[in-house]
Protein backbone atom coordinates (compact mmCIF):
# COMPACT_ATOMS: atom_id res chain seq x y z
CA UNK A 1 0.00 0.00 0.00
CA UNK A 2 1.54 3.25 -1.10
CA UNK A 3 1.63 6.28 1.13
CA UNK A 4 -0.50 9.01 -0.34
CA UNK A 5 0.49 12.66 0.22
CA UNK A 6 -1.56 14.68 2.69
CA UNK A 7 -4.05 16.92 0.99
CA UNK A 8 -5.13 20.19 2.59
CA UNK A 9 -8.69 21.28 2.28
CA UNK A 10 -10.15 24.69 3.02
CA UNK A 11 -12.71 25.01 5.77
CA UNK A 12 -16.34 25.01 4.65
CA UNK A 13 -17.87 28.42 4.38
CA UNK A 14 -14.55 30.10 3.46
CA UNK A 15 -14.39 30.43 -0.33
CA UNK A 16 -10.96 30.33 -1.80
CA UNK A 17 -10.16 32.98 -4.37
CA UNK A 18 -8.74 31.62 -7.56
CA UNK A 19 -5.03 31.68 -7.81
CA UNK A 20 -4.26 31.63 -4.03
CA UNK A 21 -2.81 28.61 -2.27
CA UNK A 22 -4.82 26.73 0.36
CA UNK A 23 -2.21 26.95 3.19
CA UNK A 24 -2.81 30.62 4.20
CA UNK A 25 -6.57 30.10 4.37
CA UNK A 26 -6.07 26.99 6.50
CA UNK A 27 -3.89 28.94 8.94
CA UNK A 28 -6.50 31.69 9.17
CA UNK A 29 -9.20 29.14 9.93
CA UNK A 30 -7.11 27.59 12.73
CA UNK A 31 -6.60 31.00 14.34
CA UNK A 32 -10.26 32.00 14.16
CA UNK A 33 -11.76 28.67 15.18
CA UNK A 34 -11.14 28.87 19.01
CA UNK A 35 -12.50 32.41 19.21
CA UNK A 36 -15.53 31.44 17.21
CA UNK A 37 -16.28 28.59 19.58
CA UNK A 38 -15.81 30.81 22.63
CA UNK A 39 -18.15 33.47 21.32
CA UNK A 40 -20.67 30.86 20.29
CA UNK A 41 -20.80 29.52 23.88
CA UNK A 42 -21.55 32.93 25.36
CA UNK A 43 -19.89 32.37 28.77
CA UNK A 44 -18.14 35.30 30.43
CA UNK A 45 -16.89 36.20 33.91
CA UNK A 46 -16.56 39.90 34.75
CA UNK A 47 -15.28 41.39 37.98
CA UNK A 48 -17.50 44.22 39.21
CA UNK A 49 -16.55 46.90 41.67
CA UNK A 50 -13.17 48.50 42.23
CA UNK A 51 -10.20 46.95 40.44
CA UNK A 52 -7.89 47.73 43.39
CA UNK A 53 -8.89 47.38 47.03
CA UNK A 54 -7.14 47.67 50.40
CA UNK A 55 -7.82 45.82 53.63
CA UNK A 56 -6.37 45.30 57.08
CA UNK A 57 -5.26 41.90 58.24
CA UNK A 58 -7.94 39.72 59.83
CA UNK A 59 -10.66 42.02 58.47
CA UNK A 60 -13.44 40.85 56.15
CA UNK A 61 -13.34 42.14 52.58
CA UNK A 62 -15.50 41.25 49.58
CA UNK A 63 -15.14 41.36 45.82
CA UNK A 64 -17.81 40.59 43.24
CA UNK A 65 -17.96 38.94 39.85
CA UNK A 66 -20.75 38.57 37.32
CA UNK A 67 -21.22 35.29 35.44
CA UNK A 68 -23.07 35.31 32.13
CA UNK A 69 -23.90 32.06 30.34
CA UNK A 70 -26.60 30.56 28.10
CA UNK A 71 -29.22 28.75 30.09
CA UNK A 72 -29.02 25.45 28.24
CA UNK A 73 -28.59 21.89 29.48
CA UNK A 74 -24.91 22.07 28.56
CA UNK A 75 -24.20 25.09 30.83
CA UNK A 76 -26.77 24.72 33.62
CA UNK A 77 -24.37 22.90 35.88
CA UNK A 78 -21.15 24.62 36.93
CA UNK A 79 -19.05 25.41 40.00
CA UNK A 80 -17.64 28.77 41.07
CA UNK A 81 -14.31 29.00 42.85
CA UNK A 82 -11.60 31.58 43.42
CA UNK A 83 -7.82 31.70 43.64
CA UNK A 84 -5.16 34.36 43.85
CA UNK A 85 -1.72 35.12 42.51
CA UNK A 86 0.75 36.78 44.86
CA UNK A 87 3.29 39.44 43.95
CA UNK A 88 5.81 36.75 42.96
CA UNK A 89 3.34 35.20 40.50
CA UNK A 90 2.66 32.05 42.54
CA UNK A 91 -0.89 30.78 42.23
CA UNK A 92 -2.82 29.41 45.18
CA UNK A 93 -5.13 26.37 44.96
CA UNK A 94 -8.73 26.99 43.99
CA UNK A 95 -11.24 27.31 46.80
CA UNK A 96 -15.03 26.90 46.49
CA UNK A 97 -17.50 29.72 47.01
CA UNK A 98 -21.13 29.92 48.06
CA UNK A 99 -22.31 30.77 44.53
CA UNK A 100 -24.58 28.21 42.90
CA UNK A 101 -26.44 28.14 39.57
CA UNK A 102 -29.83 29.82 39.56
CA UNK A 103 -33.03 29.39 37.62
CA UNK A 104 -33.36 31.01 34.22
CA UNK A 105 -35.22 30.86 30.93
CA UNK A 106 -34.42 28.05 28.57
CA UNK A 107 -32.19 28.93 25.66
CA UNK A 108 -31.75 32.49 26.98
CA UNK A 109 -28.70 34.26 28.36
CA UNK A 110 -28.63 34.18 32.16
CA UNK A 111 -26.58 36.36 34.55
CA UNK A 112 -25.50 35.42 38.06
CA UNK A 113 -23.90 37.90 40.48
CA UNK A 114 -21.50 36.25 42.87
CA UNK A 115 -19.91 37.87 45.93
CA UNK A 116 -16.84 36.39 47.58
CA UNK A 117 -16.06 37.39 51.18
CA UNK A 118 -12.57 36.79 52.54
CA UNK A 119 -10.70 37.28 55.80
CA UNK A 120 -7.05 37.66 54.83
CA UNK A 121 -4.43 36.83 57.46
CA UNK A 122 -1.71 39.34 56.67
CA UNK A 123 0.39 41.23 54.15
CA UNK A 124 1.52 37.97 52.57
CA UNK A 125 -2.02 37.56 51.18
CA UNK A 126 -1.61 40.61 48.94
CA UNK A 127 -2.26 39.74 45.31
CA UNK A 128 -4.81 39.47 42.51
CA UNK A 129 -7.93 37.42 43.25
CA UNK A 130 -9.82 35.73 40.41
CA UNK A 131 -13.27 34.22 40.04
CA UNK A 132 -13.13 30.94 38.14
CA UNK A 133 -16.19 29.14 36.71
CA UNK A 134 -15.84 25.52 35.71
CA UNK A 135 -18.33 23.94 33.29
CA UNK A 136 -18.14 20.28 32.26
CA UNK A 137 -16.32 21.16 29.04
CA UNK A 138 -14.71 24.55 29.72
CA UNK A 139 -13.35 26.87 32.38
CA UNK A 140 -13.55 30.67 32.34
CA UNK A 141 -12.00 33.12 34.79
CA UNK A 142 -12.35 36.86 35.27
CA UNK A 143 -9.87 39.69 34.93
CA UNK A 144 -9.18 39.74 38.68
CA UNK A 145 -9.31 42.18 41.59
CA UNK A 146 -6.09 43.33 43.25
CA UNK A 147 -6.29 43.41 47.06
CA UNK A 148 -3.60 45.12 49.12
CA UNK A 149 -3.41 43.76 52.67
CA UNK A 150 -1.75 45.69 55.50
CA UNK A 151 -0.81 44.23 58.85
CA UNK A 152 -1.68 47.47 60.68
CA UNK A 153 -3.37 50.77 59.93
CA UNK A 154 -1.81 54.18 59.68
CA UNK A 155 0.47 55.12 62.55
CA UNK A 156 1.86 58.56 63.17
CA UNK A 157 5.65 58.65 63.12
CA UNK A 158 7.30 59.16 66.52
CA UNK A 159 8.17 62.73 67.37
CA UNK A 160 11.85 63.48 67.00
CA UNK A 161 13.85 65.18 69.81
CA UNK A 162 14.39 68.19 67.57
CA UNK A 163 10.66 68.81 67.41
CA UNK A 164 10.34 68.59 71.19
CA UNK A 165 13.27 70.98 71.64
CA UNK A 166 11.69 73.42 69.21
CA UNK A 167 8.41 73.38 71.14
CA UNK A 168 10.23 73.85 74.45
CA UNK A 169 12.33 76.74 73.15
CA UNK A 170 9.28 78.46 71.70
CA UNK A 171 7.41 78.11 74.99
CA UNK A 172 10.38 79.49 76.94
CA UNK A 173 10.59 82.53 74.68
CA UNK A 174 6.87 83.15 75.14
CA UNK A 175 7.16 83.02 78.94
CA UNK A 176 10.19 85.32 78.95
CA UNK A 177 8.44 87.86 76.74
CA UNK A 178 5.43 87.96 79.07
CA UNK A 179 7.60 88.26 82.20
CA UNK A 180 9.74 90.97 80.61
CA UNK A 181 6.69 93.02 79.67
CA UNK A 182 5.32 92.71 83.21
CA UNK A 183 8.65 93.83 84.71
CA UNK A 184 8.82 96.86 82.42
CA UNK A 185 5.31 97.93 83.39
CA UNK A 186 6.07 97.44 87.09
CA UNK A 187 9.33 99.39 86.87
CA UNK A 188 7.63 102.25 85.04
CA UNK A 189 4.92 102.40 87.66
CA UNK A 190 7.49 102.32 90.47
CA UNK A 191 9.50 105.17 88.91
CA UNK A 192 6.41 107.36 88.76
CA UNK A 193 5.67 106.79 92.43
CA UNK A 194 2.32 107.20 94.17
CA UNK A 195 0.90 110.68 93.33
CA UNK A 196 -0.79 112.83 95.85
CA UNK A 197 -4.51 112.94 95.85
CA UNK A 198 -5.55 116.17 94.08
CA UNK A 199 -8.81 116.19 96.01
CA UNK A 200 -7.00 116.36 99.35
CA UNK A 201 -8.14 119.45 101.22
CA UNK A 202 -5.66 121.88 102.59
CA UNK A 203 -5.45 122.16 106.35
CA UNK A 204 -7.10 125.05 108.05
CA UNK A 205 -4.56 127.84 108.75
CA UNK A 206 -6.04 128.30 112.18
CA UNK A 207 -5.50 124.66 112.98
CA UNK A 208 -1.97 124.97 111.63
CA UNK A 209 -1.26 127.97 113.83
CA UNK A 210 -2.18 126.01 116.95
CA UNK A 211 -0.89 122.49 116.44
CA UNK A 212 -0.66 119.80 119.02
CA UNK A 213 2.94 119.72 120.18
CA UNK A 214 4.77 116.56 121.00
CA UNK A 215 6.79 116.80 124.21
CA UNK A 216 10.01 115.77 122.47
CA UNK A 217 9.71 118.35 119.61
CA UNK A 218 10.71 121.96 119.81
CA UNK A 219 8.17 124.70 119.25
CA UNK A 220 10.11 126.22 116.37
CA UNK A 221 10.37 122.93 114.49
CA UNK A 222 6.69 122.16 114.89
CA UNK A 223 5.61 125.62 113.74
CA UNK A 224 7.99 125.67 110.79
CA UNK A 225 6.77 122.29 109.59
CA UNK A 226 3.13 123.26 109.66
CA UNK A 227 3.81 126.54 107.84
CA UNK A 228 5.69 124.68 105.11
CA UNK A 229 2.75 122.38 104.57
CA UNK A 230 0.40 125.34 104.37
CA UNK A 231 2.64 127.09 101.85
CA UNK A 232 2.88 123.97 99.72
CA UNK A 233 -0.88 123.57 99.74
CA UNK A 234 -1.33 127.21 98.70
CA UNK A 235 1.14 126.74 95.88
CA UNK A 236 -0.73 123.64 94.72
CA UNK A 237 -3.99 125.56 94.72
CA UNK A 238 -2.42 128.35 92.69
CA UNK A 239 -0.98 125.80 90.20
CA UNK A 240 -4.41 124.22 89.58
CA UNK A 241 -5.66 127.22 87.60
CA UNK A 242 -6.92 126.72 84.02
CA UNK A 243 -3.82 128.29 82.55
CA UNK A 244 -1.62 125.89 84.48
CA UNK A 245 -3.52 122.89 83.14
CA UNK A 246 -2.89 124.03 79.60
CA UNK A 247 0.90 124.53 79.96
CA UNK A 248 3.13 121.48 80.63
CA UNK A 249 5.74 123.70 82.33
CA UNK A 250 3.18 125.10 84.72
CA UNK A 251 2.09 121.54 85.56
CA UNK A 252 5.65 120.64 86.56
CA UNK A 253 6.08 123.67 88.85
CA UNK A 254 3.91 122.34 91.72
CA UNK A 255 6.00 119.18 91.82
CA UNK A 256 9.18 121.25 91.92
CA UNK A 257 7.76 123.37 94.76
CA UNK A 258 6.88 120.25 96.68
CA UNK A 259 10.39 118.87 96.21
CA UNK A 260 11.94 122.16 97.36
CA UNK A 261 9.63 122.27 100.35
CA UNK A 262 10.57 118.73 101.35
CA UNK A 263 14.29 119.52 101.06
CA UNK A 264 13.85 122.66 103.17
CA UNK A 265 11.89 120.68 105.72
CA UNK A 266 14.61 118.06 106.01
CA UNK A 267 17.31 120.73 106.31
CA UNK A 268 15.45 122.65 109.03
CA UNK A 269 14.70 119.51 111.00
CA UNK A 270 18.38 118.60 110.94
Curated annotation (Swiss-Prot):
The entry lists its GO molecular-function terms as: transmembrane signaling receptor activity
Q: Which residues lie on this side of the membrane: Extracellular?
A: 43-163
Q: What keywords would UniProt list here?
A: Cell membrane, Disulfide bond, Glycoprotein, Immunoglobulin domain, Membrane, Phosphoprotein, Signal, Transmembrane, Transmembrane helix
Q: Where is the signal peptide?
A: 1-42
Membrane topology, Cytoplasmic segments: 185-270
Tissue specificity, in the record's words, reads: Highly expressed in neutrophils, primary monocytes, mast cells, monocytic cell lines and lymphocytes. Also expressed in spleen B and T-cells, and lung. Expressed at low level in non-immune tissue.
**Polar residues: which segments have biased composition?**
207-219, 239-250
Name of the featured protein: NFAT activation molecule 1
Lineage here is:
Eukaryota, Metazoa, Chordata, Craniata, Vertebrata
Amino acid sequence: MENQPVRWRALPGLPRPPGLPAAPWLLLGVLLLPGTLRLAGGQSVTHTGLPIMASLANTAISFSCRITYPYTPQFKVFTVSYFHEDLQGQRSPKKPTNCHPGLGTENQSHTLDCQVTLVLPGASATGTYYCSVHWPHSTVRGSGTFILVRDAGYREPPQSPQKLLLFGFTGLLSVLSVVGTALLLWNKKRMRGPGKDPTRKCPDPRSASSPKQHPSESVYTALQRRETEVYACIENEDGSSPTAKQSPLSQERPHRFEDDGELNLVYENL
